[in-house]
């Protein structure tokens, strides 16, 4: 007798072992038809999996997130099947699920073209319509390796050699194609109805630039055509909002080959940067932080003591001088501990909150660099809080409150919070981790925030909270972090004198709100499609004269506004007013101030708001008041 507990709490009993598909069929024909897989005692399995023991089971359909993952994984295999049919000499490697889709890497003797992708996608559709059953079998390591060698698939044979001896080797087959995979997969290819191949890119075997270069075909797959259409529309909109394109169009920044992963900020871009930095500076100062500045280059011995030299060396830029090794800092924390250690600290000094707009450098692979989103040189709105164990919950509450307020001011209303919990390999006792994790939970609860818990995802030195902001296109970006550190204060010898005169280690909280300033500015540019709110815009207004006779008035008006703190420029060129309006409209300036003879004589200005909205003619004081109202409204 096998007892199966279903998600609603009901229990079904079966005389003999049953498959997931048979359980679904016993519940109803609709569920049997919709079943894509099962979740057996928390593990995803195929519908063909036999259940021979009492267990908890959920039937997975396309309404579940896991169901969509199964569809995407199976579509990756469908892609490989189609490629092998059309291009038999191509070798298959790996094909995982990624956000919004999948990819599969191939080794082939020529580049795949857009025309090839069309053929492959058409063949995938033909195979899917055949509704071929997908079968799974478990085989020995030798049998699997021998099979793939016999058909010339050397990459698959190499993968098998790297699989742990304790793991099962599973082969999935449909039609004339067999692939190595952990699974699970859909029961038949007919379940794969909505998919599209997107692009081809280069990739290295096992992600190592020393290995062969492969071709990576990306695709997307969905349960409904409407969902795919919505996603493709979002991609079109994302392309229009691409910060690299807007950075060029709005003359904000550029990057060049001589300095990969580093940003050349132009005047308008640097003005935008300064608005963000000065805003953040005001917020952390108001929250009781003390701003510091630490060296960019520090001796190897400090990085060895912190553990970075041993564990992070390949991502650090290093240099040598007078027979001493140095590293350009990839992060600010060791330097902040040095400031804390400089002098004897008392419990009365705590909490101490050190903030720094710290310039860091990391040796990211050149292939991973992506505009402002992935760089080698970046500035963090970094801070470290040194406090007692009794204070860390209050400090966490204060940080949560600050972070939520900052995100709202920048126009981000939807924040997903994730709490990463203890990994298997970790420092500290279970009791210490219990207190740390519960303390972060209590802080989130006190702020009225909901969160998702990620067991095993914490760093070895402590749990952390991550803050994921959603942009205007619904994309999620992890920006903020609150990381509790149980290790670094001890490694670097940080201590304070407790009330009983004993020496104790402070609790150290690493925290950032925007994270990398470069990346956050990229997110901001795309979120607002380059049309920054007036409080952030590099120029809040541009004064435009219609003819030569208004040049003096337009110039005087520009100076008057500048003295009142408005970021304004004057465009006094001898060009048609329609040309100047169009040019500054494309630059997404919040306000265009047009002056002709009537405005000059009346000492007024004609105001056009972004989007072509005509606000009419008004005295300059009225415009300044309107702008000030805009600036107040963001808070």
From Swiss-Prot:
Location of the TGS domain: 1-61
Query: Which residues make up the binding site for Zn(2+)?
Result: 333, 384, 510
User: Where is the region Catalytic?
Assistant: 242-533
One BP term from GO: threonyl-tRNA aminoacylation
Which compartment or compartments is the protein found in?
Cytoplasm
PANTHER family in alphabetical order: THREONINE--TRNA LIGASE, CHLOROPLASTIC_MITOCHONDRIAL 2 (PTHR11451:SF44), THREONINE-TRNA LIGASE (PTHR11451)
Annotated protein name in UniProt: Threonine--tRNA ligase
What gene, per UniProt, encodes this protein? thrS
